[in-house]
Curated annotation (Swiss-Prot):
Localization in the cell: Mitochondrion matrix
Positions that bind carbamoyl phosphate: S63, T64, R65, T66, R114, H141, Q144, C276, L277, R303
Molecular function GO terms recorded: amino acid binding; ornithine carbamoyltransferase activity
PROSITE patterns in UniProt: CARBAMOYLTRANSFERASE
Gene, per the UniProt record: arg3
Catalyzed reaction equations: carbamoyl phosphate + L-ornithine = L-citrulline + phosphate + H(+)
Major site of localization recorded for this protein: mitochondrion
Protein name (database record): Ornithine carbamoyltransferase, mitochondrial
The EC number(s) this enzyme carries: 2.1.3.3
Amino acid sequence: MSFKKFPRHLLSIRDLSRGEIVKLIDRSSEIKQAYKQNFQNRRSVQMSGLSSQNVAMIFSKRSTRTRVSVESAVSCLGGNAMFLGKDDIQLGVNESLYDTSKVISSMVSGIVARVNKYSDVATLAKHASCPVINGLCDTFHPLQALADLLTIKETFKSFDGLKVAWVGDANNVLHDLMIANAKVGIHTSVAKPKDVNVRDDILSIVNEAANENGSTFEIVNDPKVAVKNADIVVTDTWISMGQEAEKEQRLKQFTGFQVTGEIMKLAKPSCKFMHCLPRHPEEVSDEVFYGENSLVFQEAENRKWTTVAVLEALLVNRGEILPPASA
């Protein structure tokens, strides 16, 4: 049985129910464990769901983790990833997004788009005849949120009652992480500068999800308040792509928001640290970033395994998100 409507897209974590998120995380873990165990035993794992199929990677922004994770995930499923950078195709320049979506989706089994604006990936999805996955835009980053949840589940075994403290900018990564946390029962406390605002429409989505799933969220202006009793502290870049000209201003704006050892001491003694990378020293000290409670490289690797699960669900299973085979 396939999903009621094909193609099914993933543009934000809001597109997934709590149950679907949990299934994707469990399936990601199952795939990861199978590959790790077979690698240790020098046996190969053969997944052929995308055999002889192509996945287009439409990237208007440079990337390390998203590109490598998507290409390796497609390979895991036996498919071929076609990287289409901003200099390779005429995305919204000499050809409309409508035309681009129609043409490319007619030749591939799926599209992963890393673009500047949410409206761009939404337009691609609206007119595509194959699934479109948001690899990052200015508003959402669902693949990162799934990798974060897998990392949290591996570490704490359960989501229930955990507290995540976010320290820093109100950006695309925060948006989907807040929504994801609210859906799976994780409490979120966000510390941001007074003159940085979380969008009202995002807060509305988070509030609805929190009410439905028994989680809470709060927004404060003091990192010391946010991290109190936190199980995980998360931060991200203060200067996203396209904001380079604002660097000096933004560094002043985020004074006092570096995650340091002193900040971590205010959280639970077992508190972990996460960062989606790339990292800059003004955001987090070396002591924390490279410390024994840092999960940053495990988190980065998990981008691959959650992407495999998403591709399998949307492309191979035609939108149906199934429980892990071992369930």
